[in-house]
């Protein structure tokens, strides 16, 4: 699921009125106020233990945290060109703050992310299991569509989920019912073909002007 930065970029022509669920359900972000309303933060010691497994496996780890309502992405020494390509593509965004790992101190970490050849990421996943960490966190391990042969592995706080954050949002807004738009079968109420950009357009046709104002 997208970060606030990628949501902003995908919906640049809209001014969303309602908070958005981001980071695979690990955070709730108010686009108008530019504030994180809720975040499922990884305990510091647990996050660093997971990072240590990345390091032992020779896989670079991006630490993604929230500090004073800013997305902070701590990075170390890149091990291959795919990591560098991602960094170069995203680092110019005004909504992302890339900082050298050597400056990391106490920023609350929302998730860890790595990308490498799929077989290496499988070895990382297995190593996390051997270290007894898989039972303590939520892991997403999936192919990188834009980089064939590579896969992502992301680690979140164990309770993080889109469903749980949606329930929290409904409580905050005093809502009883929600409609989930999705690009995948079986994952929501309304299936939209054509990816995230088509989802944004369909959302506009279905619910404007209830959810936002046109810029």
Model-derived regions, located:
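Structural signal for conserved beta-strand scaffold positions within catalytic alpha/beta enzyme cores
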Residues: 22, 63, 141, 157, ...
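Short, polar loop motifs at secondary-structure junctions
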Residues: 2, 25, 143, 183-187
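Phosphate- and divalent-cation-binding pockets in alpha/beta enzyme and binding domains
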Residues: 5-9, 123, 165, 202
